[in-house]
Swiss-Prot record:
Interacts with host TRAM1. The gene is US11. Residues 18-182 are lumenal. This is Membrane glycoprotein US11. Keywords: Disulfide bond, Early protein, Glycoprotein, Host endoplasmic reticulum, Host membrane, Host-virus interaction, Immunoglobulin domain, Inhibition of host adaptive immune response by virus, Inhibition of host MHC class I molecule presentation by virus, Late protein, Membrane, Signal, Transmembrane, Transmembrane helix, Viral immunoevasion. Belongs to the cytomegalovirus US6 family. GO terms for cellular component: host cell endoplasmic reticulum membrane; membrane. Its main location: host cell.
Length: 215
């Protein structure tokens, strides 16, 4: 539309009979709106990590317990630690922020993550800082292993499934055998209690000859 008006405006002085047109080639820009500036990112250029290690286990019921240990130049304000885990389906980053141990040390830091339920098919747990300087230095991962006692009386079927996922088949079959024996003994105990409280009394009342001393 602006191009058509420009052609008419240039042609009007030549034609002589064309009425004058008020031409506006460009619209006025909207007024600037002042916005609050974003808070500056922490200066982590002097932050250095010389050693980083993570250990993680899965307690009964798929509860993750992880420890992240760092050593280095930690005298500057620490960036926010982040955790996410990887499953067969992909990544998930909705994990609570690890809790830092209360310590005055400027050389070593430890972060804990306790009692967070993760899927049974979790492959890796990954730790990093956000934001960070030289992120590859801080990136560390660990493979969670299911922690099952030698007498797995309180282990669940989910724990046995996790053992199979970790390819620890011998431990999984052992735990399954112990759980089967446990459930069998529990059923025997229930049957004995039911027999003593109800069945035996009913037989005494209706068939007393079965308990006669003359036999």
């Amino acid at each position: 539309m602006n191009l058509v008006m420009l052609i008419l405006a240039l042609w009007a002085p030549v034609a002589g009979s064309m009425p004058e047109l008020s031409l506006t080639l460009f619209d006025e820009p909207p007024p600037l709106v002042e916005t609050e500036p974003l808070p500056p990112l922490p200066d982590v250029s002097e932050y250095r990590v010389e050693y980083s290690e993570a250990r993680c286990v899965l307690r009964s019921g798929g509860r993750l317990e992880a420890l992240w240990t760092l050593r280095g130049n930690l005298s500057v304000p620490t960036p926010t630690p982040r955790v996410y885990y990887q499953t067969l389906e992909g990544y998930a980053d909705r994990v609570p922020t690890p809790v830092e141990d209360i310590s005055e040390s400027l050389v070593a830091k430890r972060y804990w993550l306790r009692d967070y339920r993760v899927p049974q098919r979790t492959k890796l747990v990954l730790f990093y800082f956000s934001p960070c300087h030289q992120c590859q230095t801080y990136y560390v991962e660990c493979e969670p292993r299911c922690l099952v006692p030698w007498v797995p009386l309180w282990s669940s079927l989910e724990d046995i499934e996790r053992l199979l996922f970790e390819d620890r088949r011998l431990m999984a079959y052992y735990a399954l055998t112990i759980k089967s024996a446990q459930y069998t003994l529990m059923m025997v105990a229930v049957i004995q209690v039911f027999w003593g409280l109800y069945v035996k009394g009913w037989l005494h009342r209706h068939f007393p000859w079965m308990f006669s001393d003359q036999w």
